[in-house]
Amino acid sequence: MSSNSKSKKEAEEDWFGELLVDVFRLTGKGLFRFALRWPDTATLLSISVVAGMLAGLRWAWLLTVVCAAGVWAWRLGWPDSYARLIGNPVADYRRTYLVYRRRWRTICDRHGLTIPRRGKPDAEPLVPELSAVRIGSAVDTLVVRLLVGQSPKNWQAQVDGLAAAFGAQSVAIQPGRAEAGRGRDIVLRVRHHDALADPIPLARPEPDSPVVRLAHVRVGVTEHGSPWALRVSGHHILIGGATGAGKGSVLWSLVAGLAPGIKAGLIAVRCLDPKGGMEFAAGAPLFDRFAYDPESILEVLRDTTATMLARAQRLRGTTRCHRPTRAEPHIVLLVDELATLTAYADRKQRAEVDQLLGLWLAQGRAVGVSVIAAVQDPSKDVVALRQLFPVRVGLRMTETTQTAMILSTAAYQQGARCEEIPATTPGVGYVLTEGNSSVGRVRAFHVTDTDIAWLAAHFNPPARRSARSR
């Protein structure tokens, strides 16, 4: 009898002890979450409790009021330093824990990104390691260590579900070798805010600015807030996008970036506008040649090809790379609609254009001839030339297959969804550069008619300036 009552008493004590443990555990979790969500209030309450225990209630209230007044004065009077030292670090830690680390196991399990333990069906599955989290103003970067047996394609197939789980606008999966230094790592770019939603005014070059570097021509901004620059020297650039997607923004941003070199006579832009010249006529004073009808376009093509072949003959065996001078400037062939070049009714003209275009793309890079071409409707003919363009920019498109045609299938799998770009954001797109497997999201400058007129007035080539002075 006594043994039964003793066992009953021990069971009651065990139950009460477990209850206390659960209460303390839940209280601790609640306080931790409270501190994460309202760090200022939690800090003041902690100060009040400690002061009350050490000095009494009166001093606790006084100290709390003084601290609260000091914090609010700091926050209102010096918001930048408060955000840098207190606000941003706390918000970053809170987002890291609440959005990513706390739910990481559950999110991976729900999306089939865990692997069962061999021979232990009832054990917890293996979960990919979330090795690093970096919070950004618009894009968070997560470095994930893949499990043995996983590949980036497993994750790329789940980007839509992961975006919904993180409460993000989109998720892009990219190889993490360059960033993390390990081949089994991938990088998740979680975009929770669109930093490219608003138009970006053109950063006008100064009329007396130094000559532009052809290896770094600024044309816009990346979604991380850094300048978006394209390499023109030794490269060809292909720009694809639907009507109103912002192809003109990219082309005019490139012209604006090249303007100091145009004025110095080191860059000669030859513009071909097969659609009748409406888009680029306002900037004609900037161009070395401007053609918009079949006859004049063919004339420019032939002259440029002759110049290219003559340069190649002269530089062969002397140098591997052309250096622009006023006597031999770097030639930029600007084509507003690539597909229209081959749309002439005359079969002989079409064959000649195809031949000349192939020569430029194959031989022009080494002798100072760069092709910058825009295309509206990617076709099989354009896809055949795609590999000859080291830099490709995909703006808003109407179909999924067009993204793969302009960029690549791998770029689409990484999250370059050109067909999902809103029609209200012209100039937004994805850029893929030869030698870099990662796709970047960017937006070109918004170039107005006033900007074009200003460029045309201040950056004429030397030949036009001398002709005007005469």
Regions found by a protein language model. Give the residues of each.
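P-loop NTPase catalytic phosphate-binding loop
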Residues: 3-89, 205-317, 328-404, 411-415, ...
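Short acidic, glycine/proline-enriched loop segments that cap or flank alpha-helices
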Residues: 146-154, 227, 321-326, 379, ...
